[in-house]
Amino acid sequence: QDADCDVFISAAPKQMNALDGSLKDDTDKNPDGLDELQGGTRIDLLENKVTLAVPEGNPKGIKSFDNLAEKLKNGDVLLAIGNSDVPVGQYTQKIFSYYKLDEKALADAGVLTYGSNVKEVTTQVSEGTVDCGVIYATDAFSAGLTVVDEATAEMCGQVIYPAAVMKNSANPDAAKAFLDFLSTDEAMACFEAVGFSPMV
């Protein structure tokens, strides 16, 4: 936040929309009317998946999001999720809505723990301090965690990673060239190798 950069890649459209001058008249998407992106450079670069990951050995025998929803209702699980101000937390809230789960009631029942970002959630799962966590496929891959289920688009929408060159870039030509490179087959093969799906 408030750092200079040439290219911005977000884990959700919401954060990109808040900087997109073409949306400055849409107060829901760009509430502060910011115009920080270089026109015509925004693309939907990658898709990630929201997954349900478990620690080594899967001690609670969690099989799926359906199974997790039942365990949450019964108070028989400890789930790590992202805070509501980060994309992974926002996707998790959509999953709760899909299953008609009340997050506040679950938190009050002591079956939720929070992380301020997806890395913190991933660490809780990796260390086995929780029974499972909602994290991205790429984070599960990086941490070597077992994924027992992937959320569908119906459950939480698509996890789109938009990218754009910043208007205040000190190197706009190089930034655009880099963004173009990220869209090549060569770059996409690298992204796919760690769990992303290409959008371009």
Stretches found by the model and what they are:
Residues 24-36:
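Surface-exposed intrinsically disordered loops and tails
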